Amino acid sequence: MSEGIYKSPKKSPYSCEIYDSEFEREFMEELEKDPKVKKWTKNHGIRIPYVNIGSKVAHYNPDFIVEYEDGTQELIEIKGKNNLTEIIKRKQKAAKEWCEKRNIKYRLITL
C-alpha cells in the first residue's frame, strides 16, 4: 500500500487529501481533470453500517464522494481485483442500499 498526501486539489474543499493506495492517488488526478466533476473528497465523514461476518454491526467508510456539474452525486470505492472479499461484498450491499435512500449513485471500481 502506498499512502500519501495529495496536495492542493482544486476540486476538493480541503487543501490536501489523504490517499491509501496508488490507485486512489491516480483516481484523484482523474477527478481533478474531469470537466464533469464539480467537487470531490475522501474526507466526507460518511459511515455506513453493515453486518460483518461475525454478525456484528460495523461501519464502512467509502473512499470518495463526488458531485458532478449536473448536480448528481456518486459514492465511489476503489479496490484491487484481488481484494473483492466477502466483507467487501457486504459493505458494497450496504452502501448501495444507503445510496438508494439518498438518491446517490454507488460505484465500485476494481483495478
Label the model's feature ranges.
Residues 1-111:
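Electrostatic, structured charged patches in enzyme active sites and in nucleic-acid/phosphate-binding
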